[in-house]
Amino acid sequence: MTVGLGVDIVEIARMRRVMERTPSFAAKVFTEAERAYCDSKANPTTHYAARFAAKEAVCKALGTGILVDGMRMTDVEVVRDSRGKPTVALHGQAAARAKDQGVLDIPLSLTYTHSVAVANAVAITEASQVERERRRDVKAELAQQFKEMRGMLDDLSSTTAHKADEIHGQ
Protein backbone atom coordinates (compact mmCIF):
# COMPACT_ATOMS: atom_id res chain seq x y z
CA MET A 1 0.00 0.00 0.00
CA THR A 2 1.29 3.45 -0.88
CA VAL A 3 -1.37 5.57 0.79
CA GLY A 4 -4.63 4.49 2.38
CA LEU A 5 -7.67 6.75 2.62
CA GLY A 6 -10.60 6.28 4.95
CA VAL A 7 -13.76 8.35 5.36
CA ASP A 8 -16.74 7.68 7.60
CA ILE A 9 -19.92 9.50 8.57
CA VAL A 10 -22.05 8.83 11.65
CA GLU A 11 -25.53 10.14 12.38
CA ILE A 12 -25.42 11.77 15.82
CA ALA A 13 -29.04 10.83 16.60
CA ARG A 14 -28.25 7.19 15.84
CA MET A 15 -25.23 7.30 18.15
CA ARG A 16 -27.47 8.78 20.86
CA ARG A 17 -30.01 5.95 20.44
CA VAL A 18 -27.32 3.26 20.57
CA MET A 19 -25.80 4.74 23.71
CA GLU A 20 -29.23 5.02 25.40
CA ARG A 21 -30.23 1.44 24.48
CA THR A 22 -26.85 -0.08 25.37
CA PRO A 23 -25.25 1.65 28.36
CA SER A 24 -22.14 -0.58 28.10
CA PHE A 25 -21.51 0.54 24.49
CA ALA A 26 -19.21 3.44 25.40
CA ALA A 27 -17.01 1.28 27.64
CA LYS A 28 -16.64 -1.39 24.93
CA VAL A 29 -15.92 1.00 22.08
CA PHE A 30 -14.05 3.97 23.57
CA THR A 31 -10.97 4.17 25.76
CA GLU A 32 -11.17 5.71 29.20
CA ALA A 33 -9.46 8.87 27.91
CA GLU A 34 -11.91 9.14 24.99
CA ARG A 35 -14.88 8.76 27.34
CA ALA A 36 -13.48 11.37 29.73
CA TYR A 37 -13.00 13.82 26.85
CA CYS A 38 -16.47 13.28 25.36
CA ASP A 39 -18.23 13.38 28.72
CA SER A 40 -16.57 16.72 29.51
CA LYS A 41 -18.28 18.38 26.54
CA ALA A 42 -21.68 20.11 26.46
CA ASN A 43 -22.88 17.64 23.79
CA PRO A 44 -21.03 14.39 24.52
CA THR A 45 -22.88 12.37 21.86
CA THR A 46 -21.54 14.60 19.09
CA HIS A 47 -17.98 13.89 20.20
CA TYR A 48 -18.64 10.17 20.62
CA ALA A 49 -20.02 10.10 17.06
CA ALA A 50 -16.94 11.92 15.73
CA ARG A 51 -14.62 9.47 17.49
CA PHE A 52 -16.60 6.48 16.25
CA ALA A 53 -16.35 7.85 12.70
CA ALA A 54 -12.61 8.34 13.24
CA LYS A 55 -12.14 4.72 14.32
CA GLU A 56 -13.96 3.53 11.20
CA ALA A 57 -12.04 5.92 8.92
CA VAL A 58 -8.68 4.83 10.34
CA CYS A 59 -9.54 1.16 9.84
CA LYS A 60 -10.56 1.88 6.25
CA ALA A 61 -7.27 3.73 5.71
CA LEU A 62 -5.45 0.65 7.02
CA GLY A 63 -7.42 -1.50 4.58
CA THR A 64 -9.37 -3.44 7.18
CA GLY A 65 -12.53 -3.21 9.17
CA ILE A 66 -12.96 -2.96 12.89
CA LEU A 67 -13.32 -6.30 14.65
CA VAL A 68 -11.29 -8.07 11.92
CA ASP A 69 -8.24 -10.21 12.73
CA GLY A 70 -8.67 -9.66 16.45
CA MET A 71 -8.79 -5.88 16.16
CA ARG A 72 -10.84 -4.18 18.85
CA MET A 73 -12.55 -0.80 18.75
CA THR A 74 -10.23 0.46 21.48
CA ASP A 75 -7.17 -0.43 19.36
CA VAL A 76 -7.81 2.85 17.52
CA GLU A 77 -7.86 5.80 19.90
CA VAL A 78 -8.44 9.46 19.18
CA VAL A 79 -6.17 11.60 21.34
CA ARG A 80 -5.33 15.28 21.26
CA ASP A 81 -1.85 16.67 20.69
CA SER A 82 -0.35 19.54 22.68
CA ARG A 83 -2.26 22.05 20.51
CA GLY A 84 -5.59 20.25 20.93
CA LYS A 85 -5.58 18.75 17.44
CA PRO A 86 -7.12 15.27 17.22
CA THR A 87 -4.59 12.60 16.33
CA VAL A 88 -4.55 8.81 16.22
CA ALA A 89 -2.95 6.46 18.74
CA LEU A 90 -2.88 2.83 17.63
CA HIS A 91 -2.75 -0.11 20.00
CA GLY A 92 -2.81 -3.90 19.71
CA GLN A 93 -3.79 -5.30 16.32
CA ALA A 94 -4.27 -1.87 14.76
CA ALA A 95 -0.68 -0.95 15.64
CA ALA A 96 0.56 -4.31 14.31
CA ARG A 97 -1.35 -3.86 11.05
CA ALA A 98 0.03 -0.33 10.60
CA LYS A 99 3.57 -1.53 11.28
CA ASP A 100 3.23 -4.41 8.79
CA GLN A 101 2.13 -1.93 6.12
CA GLY A 102 4.92 0.55 6.86
CA VAL A 103 2.53 3.26 8.05
CA LEU A 104 4.47 6.29 9.29
CA ASP A 105 1.57 8.57 10.17
CA ILE A 106 -2.22 8.80 10.02
CA PRO A 107 -3.35 12.42 9.80
CA LEU A 108 -6.94 12.74 10.96
CA SER A 109 -9.65 15.31 10.32
CA LEU A 110 -12.91 15.43 12.28
CA THR A 111 -15.93 17.65 11.73
CA TYR A 112 -19.60 17.66 12.61
CA THR A 113 -22.88 19.44 12.04
CA HIS A 114 -26.02 19.30 14.16
CA SER A 115 -26.89 15.92 12.60
CA VAL A 116 -23.71 14.11 11.48
CA ALA A 117 -20.07 13.62 12.39
CA VAL A 118 -17.48 12.97 9.69
CA ALA A 119 -13.91 11.70 9.90
CA ASN A 120 -11.19 11.48 7.28
CA ALA A 121 -7.95 9.54 7.81
CA VAL A 122 -4.94 9.04 5.54
CA ALA A 123 -2.43 6.27 6.19
CA ILE A 124 0.92 7.59 4.95
CA THR A 125 3.41 4.80 4.34
CA GLU A 126 7.14 4.51 3.79
CA ALA A 127 6.37 3.61 0.17
CA SER A 128 4.49 6.88 -0.34
CA GLN A 129 7.45 8.84 1.02
CA VAL A 130 9.84 6.98 -1.31
CA GLU A 131 7.51 7.68 -4.25
CA ARG A 132 7.37 11.37 -3.33
CA GLU A 133 11.17 11.52 -3.18
CA ARG A 134 11.41 9.68 -6.51
CA ARG A 135 9.07 12.21 -8.12
CA ARG A 136 11.10 15.04 -6.62
CA ASP A 137 14.28 13.46 -8.07
CA VAL A 138 12.63 13.14 -11.50
CA LYS A 139 11.66 16.82 -11.41
CA ALA A 140 15.20 17.82 -10.44
CA GLU A 141 16.63 15.60 -13.18
CA LEU A 142 14.31 17.11 -15.79
CA ALA A 143 15.20 20.62 -14.65
CA GLN A 144 18.91 19.79 -14.98
CA GLN A 145 18.39 18.28 -18.44
CA PHE A 146 16.45 21.38 -19.48
CA LYS A 147 19.33 23.62 -18.36
CA GLU A 148 21.84 21.48 -20.26
CA MET A 149 19.70 21.51 -23.42
CA ARG A 150 19.21 25.26 -23.10
CA GLY A 151 22.97 25.67 -22.83
CA MET A 152 23.51 23.49 -25.91
CA LEU A 153 20.94 25.51 -27.86
CA ASP A 154 22.62 28.75 -26.79
CA ASP A 155 26.01 27.36 -27.88
CA LEU A 156 24.55 26.14 -31.16
CA SER A 157 22.91 29.49 -31.76
CA SER A 158 26.12 31.45 -31.14
CA THR A 159 28.16 28.97 -33.24
CA THR A 160 25.66 29.25 -36.10
CA ALA A 161 25.71 33.04 -35.87
CA HIS A 162 29.53 33.04 -35.86
CA LYS A 163 29.65 30.74 -38.94
CA ALA A 164 27.10 32.93 -40.72
CA ASP A 165 29.29 35.97 -40.02
CA GLU A 166 32.30 34.12 -41.49
CA ILE A 167 30.37 33.17 -44.61
CA HIS A 168 29.17 36.71 -45.17
CA GLY A 169 32.65 38.06 -44.54
CA GLN A 170 32.00 39.97 -41.40
Please name every model-derived segment.
Residues 1-5, 9-170:
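Core catalytic alpha/beta fold that binds nucleotide/phospho-ligands
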